[in-house]
Amino acid sequence: MKVKMSKLIILSGPSGVGKGTIESLLLKNKNLLIKLAISATTREKRRDEINGVNYFFLTVQEFKEKIENDEFIEWSCHFNNYYGTLKSQIKFIQSQNFIPLLEIDTTGAKNIIENYKNKGELSQLLTIFILPPSIESLKNRIQKRLTETNIQINQRLEKAKAEIKIKNLFKFQVVNDNLEECVAQIEKIISKEIQKT
């Protein structure tokens, strides 16, 4: 497969839509030549997460210093926690001849899309928005995680409704109704789009 290493793949969508599961399945497909750009965050580490594998867990002070030093390709703050993608992660992945996959929230994705558009480099982005089959199914997925209170779940659902409204900023939209079909559709999109570069 012909690959342009300056390309970025952005996978985004509401919290609870299955981005993490989809991402892990995509990464198993070695033919795609993608590697996950690990995000940095200030949120509390979940019991099954590992620093440097799932996220780079930073203090608020460390995160703010990196913002000041322009070390992020994108960053945002949600539910009192900072999230961002370090430029060094992107460069590291590209130096290994892989395409960085960013699994990020819609605010971060929107910031990157606007930044690339302003620089006339939108063609370097492959943007994919993952949709839930319905808001009710999204609510069920979030509840099954057992990590949020009812208030937090309702906040996430309200945020999801707003995020879905910007889905057309993304080149592709895929509904995660059936996980295997969703992943297969995204694999086809990535293979086809990367060959165009």
Swiss-Prot record:
This protein's UniProt keywords: ATP-binding, Cytoplasm, Kinase, Nucleotide-binding, Transferase
Record's catalysed reaction(s): GMP + ATP = GDP + ADP
Binding site for ATP: G13, P14, S15, G16, V17, G18, K19, G20
Location of the protein in the cell: Cytoplasm
Cross-referenced PROSITE patterns: GUANYLATE_KINASE_1, GUANYLATE_KINASE_2
One Pfam entry name: Guanylate_kin
EC number: 2.7.4.8
GO molecular function per UniProt: ATP binding; guanylate kinase activity
Location of the Guanylate kinase-like domain: 6-191
Entry's family note: Belongs to the guanylate kinase family.
HAMAP family linked to this entry: Guanylate_kinase (MF_00328)
NCBIfam families: guanyl_kin (TIGR03263)
Protein name: Guanylate kinase
Organism: Mesomycoplasma hyopneumoniae (strain J / ATCC 25934 / NCTC 10110) (Mycoplasma hyopneumoniae)
Gene assigned in the entry: gmk
